[in-house]
Amino acid sequence: MVGDLSDVRAMEQDFPSTRNESGYQRFRLGDFVFSRDEYFVHIEWRAQGKKLSHTMSADVFLRALMRDVAWNFFYGWVNFDDVFGTRNRYDRVELYAGRYHPVYKEQGLDHSACFDSSFVMQAFRSMLDDWTNVGYDPFAAPAETGLTWQGKKQGHNRAALNRARESCRRMPGLPGDVPLRTDRNRYPINRAFLDVPQDEPVIEAEPGFEHEVHAFNLFAYLSRSDVTWNPSVTSVCKHSLFCPTTEEYILPVKHANDRIEWFLQLSDQIEWRIEDRATGRPRASVVMRAGDVAAMPADIRHQGFSRRRSMLLVWENADPRLPQLYEDGILPPSLAGEFQEPGSVK
Amino acid sequence: MSFTDTKTVFGSLDSYVKGGIEVIDDDRRHYAFSNVFEVASLAKPYEKVVVGKNLRYVIETLRAEGTSDWFTASHDESVIVMDGSVEIDLVKLDDPERIAPAHIEGSIRLEAPPQGRRMGLMKLRRGHQALLPKGAAYRFRSTDGVGVLVLQTIHGPHSVEKWSEICLT
């Protein structure tokens, strides 16, 4: 959940900021300094007594920052690009620059630092609030939000930044659970999914079971998503979470999970660029079309490319013990060991 | 800005195009890559073929053809209809602990018709997702030829794993 931004001003003294000639605030978290101008975000740090800097498109940075905040730093590593990112250490967050880039690492020019998650969250929310201009929605597809991220500081777009991530307890539409998406609650059908049938299942519940006999139109629910690359939760089986999402253009981060996660492509196509988690070395390209299922191993980073808006079911195991079990090598990073000789059935 | 593709492409048993893996420096088996329509096309009716596995949690693909046996579980499950039309009967078991005690996970097949109160009927089409509540017995009935279901559950005695047969290698 992004949460309310009304309290961020009170926190600014913890990461002192000043405004530059473009009107944007400058932020410092430990030895990391963040600034933006009309086009770019600049990240600075020190290593081996030298000042290092890294520049990203402000558009790319804000899209990544939005996911990191909305996902509460997600599982594992959220690489904003090949150099900068965050690692969720659960209650703590590690910020790094060059840590997982072979050249920065080899030259000793990488830097990382851990902070309390709440502190980084407040800082990132403040950064998002200040650096997002009116009209720009970091969750929207580029075709929907245009180029309003450019230029000198101009206003805010807090409505876009304050969206809450929709996580059901059992299933959307059940009494007391997250509501279904409709025109009435301001979830119109997205322009790319106007052809998706909106019929709801027929439910014939016996008296007394109206709250337990439940189904909904998942594809219609997704057709009304107003965000891209931002999974919601639509069903729960203990730690097993079905997290469907709609994707368009490029996943703004290279996500390196601290556990195996799975994708089930529900519609259209996504191409995944797979790299080694620690070095970024290319490993594979995975093309997923409707009906395809694939695991994302626990030792990779992945980035998706969706040429039109598509529906993807992300499947997560939210067991909090998993990061340590993979880190310690107790669990293998992939399912390769499950394969038997052809024809055998376990 | 306009885009040429305005049609959403879903898959079906009759029309699916499987993707693939371009290996650069890797092993295809790491991705356990399969396709639910292809798996269902080769499966027996309501065979619970595991297509995703995350420790004890699984995603199973079921070929919906005719009427299934009755199943229950000690935990919530959910099902998505990927193709076809399916009806689901639900019965609140009088004694769910006897068939699926809390320490037993996964779908359990009932050996006899369920004893309990009828909860209702759900009629689902492609894209619909239904809750299969814990302690309830359920059965599927395909109403429009052969369909494809995706089940969110936990590995159980009826789960079938055949990774080498279904995955790209």
Regions from the language model: what does each represent?
Chain B
Residues 1-60, 67-69, 166-169:
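A short, N-terminal "cap"/entry segment at the start of jelly-roll beta-barrel domains
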Residues 144-163:
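A short hydrophobic beta-strand segment most commonly corresponding to one strand
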Residues 93-136:
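Short acidic-glycine-tyrosine-enriched beta hairpin
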Residues 69-71, 76-81, 122, 130:
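His/acidic/aromatic-lined binding-pocket segments of jelly-roll/cupin-type domains
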Residues 88-90, 151:
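Short hydrophobic/aromatic-rich beta-strand segments that constitute the beta-sheet cores
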Residues 58-75, 92-96:
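Conserved short histidine dyad/triad with adjacent acidic residue
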Residues 62-66, 126-127, 133-135, 145:
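Tight coil/turn sites that cap or link beta-strands
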